[in-house]
């Protein structure tokens, strides 16, 4: 490993040994420990601001007298990435502290509350005061930073937090493990190892192939043993003390298991675990040396990765030996320094008890058995029905005025509502409310109305575009028929209007009606151009988008503004401008992505099937007259089904048109436009944050999830 260069400082062994550290591996510390400490300070302040439960005053975080945990775990990490991984690790510490005080079931619920904050694509609606929304506010800035810094590695790291940690952590049985294999299974689910390695890769900006990951996996396994055993070794006394004082519900520790299963005293069990730690480190070194000697042409990145694994082992060990997290409990011991429960060599898990979840008794189904009536009575009833005299009223006259079932009405609505959603609207509502502060109940009414309007417009759009798919699923009119779907969509507009009238202010109703007129006006021109095979000029297309797509976003702002007491007309005008820009970005992005892999959810280049003049086509027309002739000729001859509906163009025809658009520069101009709009949106958000005196991480997160940064250029 002499070929490698280091930015970190080597810790002298004699210095490390003063803390009780006994690792056999070299220890290094990041030169910018101040960045990691600053991230911890920010996390503590943010937790107090957004969560406010006082937990930040009781948790021991990453800083220590020998250095920040992150500076020792990622000594070769990029300085600009050290802050974000430090922030996330502090989150892990405070979250683990909470879970140690909970039962397994309650810990799982705590994981569930945190999960949405780590998912940039989460589009569920959360009450502003809910734990989920508090966590989203807490983590939005960090999530944005990770994605913007490195979309690939940042997204992978966040996904590992969400999927590999939250989704499986604490799902293990609460029974005390009896064998090493049992214990290792528990540690792999709640120890966070699956999350740690993506953090190292992100911090160090290393990208490895699947083959390289597989090659180094045995080394990773040895490292995980050393990391876990060291954590258990240095945390054992603290965990016992917390269990016996009621501060924790359970203990999961290899020292406890060795003591319990082998009948050893605590001191003997710790000595055994110490040998296990050194054995795991020796195994890492042996596997490392074997791999290097058998692969003399190994890439420098893979060599770095193997070295960084070892530095994580030693850095973790050193920090554990000195950090306040594992040592401050000592000040709470009894005067003679003894810890209750350590003398008999075992600690019982107070949470290891069975729960009788069976409720005795019968279940009433609510269904009665049919009675056996008299046949004669039934026959008399039939005779009365079919042999009635003219003086008797017909049964039709006697039918009660009962309401019809609403199944036929709501079925298309239910179908469209059940489909996967991009979640932009719900994310945008939460983001705008950071500034507008609409009360939660009122915000729920606005959100419900917007959802109905949006779903109604989707049903009509699919009908008007002859689109067979919506999010990869048959569109509503394909399942329920065009006429029924139109009827259902129209009813949704009426229902949304009634909901606004009955639950919101007159100003909100006025905003809704004005917004609906704008939406229909924009849609009319989109349909007109398609029907008349008339390609609009770029300016006309943007005005249509401002009415159709931007109109929905502007209407949302106006509805929220009507219910917000905080800001005047000038601020609302700024927000409306921001929404119009967002509408342009959103629609043009959708036009561009229709020609990319995203289109698989709707159908490959479906806009061409519909004869739609999307933005890339408009740009191509303005730059290449020859393209105009070819596209118009093909659109004019589009095949139709027996019902008069357009059918798909052949793939070869589509590929030809896409090559023409690419050759004309239509895709390049579209991508250039999108990047300019994204920068403009970022500037507008910054100006609003300055004007309103409040940053809006949720709005920036919303923009980051739509970002075109790193988007592949369409080339044919």
Swiss-Prot record:
Mg(2+) 4 binds at residues 461, 465. Mg(2+) 2 binds at residue 96. InterPro entries: Isoprenoid_synthase_dom_sf, Polyprenyl_synt, Polyprenyl_synt_CS. It catalyses: 4 isopentenyl diphosphate + dimethylallyl diphosphate = (2E,6E,10E,14E)-geranylfarnesyl diphosphate + 4 diphosphate; (2E,6E,10E,14E)-geranylfarnesyl diphosphate = fusoxypene A + diphosphate; (2E,6E,10E,14E)-geranylfarnesyl diphosphate = fusoxypene B + diphosphate; (2E,6E,10E,14E)-geranylfarnesyl diphosphate = fusoxypene C + diphosphate. Its EC number is 4.2.3.-, 2.5.1.-. Keywords: Isoprene biosynthesis, Lyase, Magnesium, Metal-binding, Multifunctional enzyme, Transferase. Isopentenyl diphosphate binds at residues 422, 425, 454, 471. Substrate binds at residues 96, 231. Mg(2+) 1 binds at residue 96. One of its GO terms (molecular function) is metal ion binding. It comes from the Eukaryota. Dimethylallyl diphosphate binds at residues 470, 548-549, 587, 594, 602. Residues 329-711 are annotated as: Geranylfarnesyl diphosphate synthase. Bifunctional sesterterpenoid synthase that performs both prenyl transferase and terpene cyclase activity, converting isopentenyl diphosphate and dimethylallyl diphosphate into geranylfarnesyl diphosphate (GFPP) and then converting GFPP into the enantiomeric sesterterpenes with a 5-6-7-3-5 ring system fusoxypene A, fusoxypene B, fusoxypene C and (-)-astellatene. In the N-terminal section; belongs to the terpene synthase family. In the C-terminal section; belongs to the FPP/GGPP synthase family. PANTHER family: GERANYLGERANYL PYROPHOSPHATE SYNTHASE (PTHR12001), THIJ_PFPI FAMILY PROTEIN (AFU_ORTHOLOGUE AFUA_3G01210)-RELATED (PTHR12001:SF72). This is Fusoxypene synthase. It comes from Fusarium oxysporum.
């Amino acid at each position: 490993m002499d070929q490698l260069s280091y930015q970190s400082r080597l810790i002298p062994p004699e210095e490390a040994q003063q803390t009780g550290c006994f690792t056999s591996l070299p220890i290094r510390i990041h030169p910018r420990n101040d960045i990691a400490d600053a991230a911890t300070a920010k996390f503590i302040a943010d937790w107090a601001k957004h969560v406010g439960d006082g937990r930040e005053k009781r948790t021991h975080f990453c800083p220590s007298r020998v250095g920040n945990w992150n500076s020792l775990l990622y000594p070769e990490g990029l300085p600009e990435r050290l802050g974000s991984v430090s922030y996330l690790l502090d989150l892990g510490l405070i979250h683990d502290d909470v879970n140690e005080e909970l039962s397994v079931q309650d810990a799982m619920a705590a994981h569930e509350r945190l999960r949405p904050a780590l998912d940039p694509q989460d589009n569920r609606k959360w009450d502003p005061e809910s734990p989920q929304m508090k966590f989203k506010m807490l983590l939005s800035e960090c999530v944005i930073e990770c994605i913007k810094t490195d979309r690939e590695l940042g997204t992978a790291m966040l996904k590992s937090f969400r999927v590999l940690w939250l989704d499986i952590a604490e799902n293990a049985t609460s029974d005390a493990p009896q064998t090493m294999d049992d214990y290792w299974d528990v540690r792999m689910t709640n120890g966070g190892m699956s999350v740690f390695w993506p953090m190292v890769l992100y911090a160090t900006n290393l990208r490895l192939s699947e083959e390289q990951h597989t090659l180094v996996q045995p080394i990773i396994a040895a490292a995980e043993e050393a990391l876990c055993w060291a954590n258990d070794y240095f945390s054992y006394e603290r965990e016992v003390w917390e269990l016996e004082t009621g501060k924790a519900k359970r203990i999961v520790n290899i020292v406890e298991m060795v003591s319990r299963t082998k009948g050893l005293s605590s001191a003997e069990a710790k000595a055994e675990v110490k040998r296990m730690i050194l054995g795991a480190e020796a195994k890492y070194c042996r596997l490392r040396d074997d791999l290097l000697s058998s692969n003399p042409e190994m890439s420098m990145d893979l060599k770095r990765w193997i070295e960084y694994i070892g530095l994580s082992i030693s850095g973790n060990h050193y920090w554990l030996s000195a950090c306040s997290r594992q040592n401050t409990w000592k000040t709470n011991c009894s005067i003679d320094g003894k810890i209750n429960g350590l003398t008999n060599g075992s600690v019982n898990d107070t949470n290891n008890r069975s729960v009788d979840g069976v409720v005795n008794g019968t279940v009433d189904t609510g269904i009665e058995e049919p009675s056996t009536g008299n046949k004669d009575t039934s026959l008399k009833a039939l005779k009365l029905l079919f042999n009635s005299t003219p003086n008797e009223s017909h049964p039709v006259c006697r039918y009660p005025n009962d309401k019809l079932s609403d199944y036929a009405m709501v079925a298309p609505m239910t179908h469209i509502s059940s489909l996967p959603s991009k979640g932009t609207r719900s994310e945008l509502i939460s983001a705008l409310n950071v500034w507008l502060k609409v009360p939660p109940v009122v915000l729920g009414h606005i959100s419900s109305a917007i959802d109905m309007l949006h779903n109604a417009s989707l049903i009509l759009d699919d009908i008007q575009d002859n689109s067979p798919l919506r999010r990869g699923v048959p569109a509503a009119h394909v399942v329920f028929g065009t006429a029924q779907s139109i009827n259902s969509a129209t009813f949704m507009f009426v229902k949304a209007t009634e909901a606004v009238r009955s639950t919101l202010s007159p100003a909100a109703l006025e905003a809704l009606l004005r917004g609906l007129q704008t939406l229909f006006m924009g849609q009319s021109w989109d349909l007109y151009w398609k029907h008349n095979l008339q390609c609009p000029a770029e300016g006309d297309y943007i005005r249509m988008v401002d009415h159709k797509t931007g109109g929905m976003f502007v209407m949302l702002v106006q509805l929220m503004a009507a219910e917000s007491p905080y800001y005047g007309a000038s601020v609302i005008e700024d927000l409306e401008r921001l929404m119009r820009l967002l509408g342009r970005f959103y629609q043009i992005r959708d036009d561009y992505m229709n020609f990319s892999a995203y289109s698989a959810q709707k159908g490959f280049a479906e806009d061409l099937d519909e004869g739609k003049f999307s933005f890339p086509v408009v740009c191509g027309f303005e730059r290449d007259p020859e393209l105009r002739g070819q596209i118009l000729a093909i659109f004019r001859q589009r095949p139709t089904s027996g019902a008069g509906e357009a059918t798909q163009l052949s793939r070869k025809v589509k590929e030809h048109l896409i090559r023409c658009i690419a050759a004309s520069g239509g895709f390049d101009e579209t991508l250039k436009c999108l990047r300019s709009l994204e920068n403009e949106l970022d500037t507008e958000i910054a100006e609003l944050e300055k004007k309103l005196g409040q940053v809006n991480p949720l709005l920036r997160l919303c923009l980051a999830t739509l970002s075109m940064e790193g988007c592949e250029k369409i080339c044919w």
